[in-house]
Regions:
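Outer-membrane beta-barrel pore domains
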Residues: 37-40, 74-77, 82-87, 184-190, ...
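Surface-exposed coil loops of outer-membrane beta-barrel proteins
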Residues: 20-45, 74-93, 101-182, 187-192, ...
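Acidic/polar N-terminal loop/beta-strand segments that form early-domain functional surfaces
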Residues: 16-22, 51, 56-60, 65-71, ...
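Residues on the lipid-exposed face of transmembrane beta-strands in outer-membrane beta-barrel proteins
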Residues: 15, 19, 44, 48, ...
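Surface-exposed extracellular loop regions of Gram-negative outer-membrane beta-barrel proteins
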Residues: 52-73, 149-151, 202, 206-216
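Transmembrane beta-strands of outer-membrane beta-barrel proteins
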Residues: 11-19, 64-66, 106, 156-158, ...
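Sec/Tat signal peptide C-region and signal peptidase I cleavage site
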Residues: 2-6
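Short coil turns and loop connectors of transmembrane beta-barrels in diderm outer membranes
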Residues: 7-9, 58-61, 72, 102-103, ...
């Protein structure tokens, strides 16, 4: 029998669908159409994003999440799969968790990255297109992590995982380590995978009831014997003008050295380049529908392909 205070386990299914139209203002829109070097929302004309279906089971002590994606955005997000399973390229997240105590949770399986301000699901981002910092950071991990509530708004996460974005199994025998220290919604993140490492700060501040400022900054170094690296920072000011409409800007500066991650695509004689991208997005909400008109301008230091 259940006590009156006990809650029955809950199984829920949720999800989103996104579609879009994209056109270049000063570049071809035919078979020679180009797009920014960031991830997702790169296809011309009327295009598909993805369908996202999430099944979750929440018990008092344990639960699971099965997060499936279908469509071009989902395919791009799980670019390293299928590695073994024929259906591996639809699994965005697949993990189980155990609430060891009120302050400790263990999670094992495939989960989206803890680094960065933006996420794979467009419904959870203010801007529809994505930043360079998000695009060239990790997307997902498979491993085990421990989350600790340290009290007084402090939190700590530690993780041991397969190499970055190898989500179905580990073909290399190498392992990555991750750390996150959080305080009152501000997070300092660290990831080391196969000699490469990334340090990331993600946070935000409510400057008033209607004005929010998000912040993301990161530095990535490829490996001990490779000088390639990138760094960048982005600001996300957002203002709510009414209950149904908000306006947001993403201003990002991104720089690569020794070829970096290949994001910009054109470099000087030393292999260096930088890009400044400004994205203005409106967000209009009608019930469960979000409509996001967006204008994006990317300007690179070299003669790279950009819009």
């Amino acid at each position: 029998t259940l006590n009156a205070q006990d809650e029955a386990p809950k199984l829920s299914v949720s999800g989103t669908v996104d579609v879009y139209y994209r056109a270049n203002l000063s570049a071809p829109n035919d078979e020679d159409a180009i797009a920014p070097g960031s991830s997702f929302a790169q296809l011309p004309g009327f295009s598909l994003g993805m369908a996202n279906v999430i099944a979750s089971y929440e018990g008092e002590k344990a639960g699971f999440v099965a997060d499936l994606v279908f469509g071009p955005r989902g395919t791009d997000a799980i670019f390293a799969s299928p590695m073994y399973s024929g259906s591996g390229n639809i699994v965005n997240q697949l993990y189980a968790y155990w609430n060891v105590s009120e302050s400790v949770t263990l999670t094992m399986g495939n989960f989206n990255t803890f680094l960065g301000y933006e996420v794979i699901s467009p419904a959870a981002n203010f801007n529809y297109s994505t930043s360079y910092l998000f695009s060239y950071g990790p997307f997902s991990h498979t491993g085990i992590k421990a989350d600790f509530d340290l009290g007084s708004d402090w939190s700590l996460m530690t993780a041991v995982m397969n190499p970055t974005d190898l989500t179905e199994f580990n073909p290399t025998g190498d392992y990555a380590v991750g750390l996150q220290l959080g305080y009152a919604g501000q997070y300092l993140n660290y990831l080391n995978s196969q000699g490469a490492y990334e340090v990331d700060f993600t946070g935000g501040f409510d400057l008033s009831e209607s004005f929010f400022l998000g912040v993301n900054a990161a530095y990535f170094d490829a490996s001990d014997d490779n000088d390639a690296s990138f760094a960048g920072a982005a600001l996300y000011p957002q203002i709510a003008t009414s209950e149904s409409f908000s306006l947001g800007l993403r201003a990002e500066y991104f720089v690569e050295t020794e070829g970096g991650a290949g994001a910009i695509g054109a470099y000087d004689v030393d292999g260096d380049a930088d890009i400044f991208a400004v994205t203005l997005t409106g967000s209009y909400t009608v019930g469960n529908l979000m409509i996001k008109p967006e204008l994006r301008l990317d300007s690179a230091s070299e003669e790279a392909t950009f819009i």
